[in-house]
């Protein structure tokens, strides 16, 4: 089924599911799209990455993961259907965090002293990059929802 606005509005309410909350732990992930530019509630510019999970590591509970992936009808979602988000503030004092992620965790070459790349140049190379992401659970501001957030990333190899 399509995910267009119209098709979502036409979907029977019995087919609407909450996003899957994967268990806390470390997951192998892949980037399938360019990050989106956005702003925080306070107006700070940021880049939002969406990571798709490809596999759990040994610190993820198999029982908790199976429970999280089980639909109401008993069938299992594919882990590859699950994504998590991670933001980087795009401020002068936080730019190093984005650079560290791109160079250290994704292995994107930043160029040389004589011919350095810009962060924008490096961002053009993110699609298809794999890495590890550690997922934690955080409550929403209103306390009604729990979100799976990435608190740190690491190189895969």
Where do the protein language model's features map onto the residues?
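Short beta-rich binding modules
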Residues: 1-157
């Amino acid at each position: 089924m399509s995910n267009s606005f119209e098709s979502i509005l036409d979907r029977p309410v019995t087919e609407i599911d909450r996003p899957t909350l994967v268990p806390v732990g470390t997951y192998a992930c892949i980037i399938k799209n360019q990050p989106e530019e956005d702003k925080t509630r306070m107006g700070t510019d940021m880049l939002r990455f969406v990571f798709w999970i490809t596999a759990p590591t040994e610190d993820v509970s198999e029982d908790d993961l199976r429970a999280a992936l089980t639909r109401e009808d008993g069938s299992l979602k594919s882990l590859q259907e699950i994504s998590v988000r991670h933001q980087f503030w795009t401020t002068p004092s936080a730019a190093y965090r984005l650079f560290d992620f791109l160079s250290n965790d994704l292995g994107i070459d930043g160029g040389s002293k004589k011919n350095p790349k810009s962060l924008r140049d490096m961002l053009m190379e993110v699609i298809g990059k794999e890495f590890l992401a550690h997922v934690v659970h955080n409550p929403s501001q209103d306390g009604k929802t729990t979100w799976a957030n990435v608190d740190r990333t690491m190189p895969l190899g």
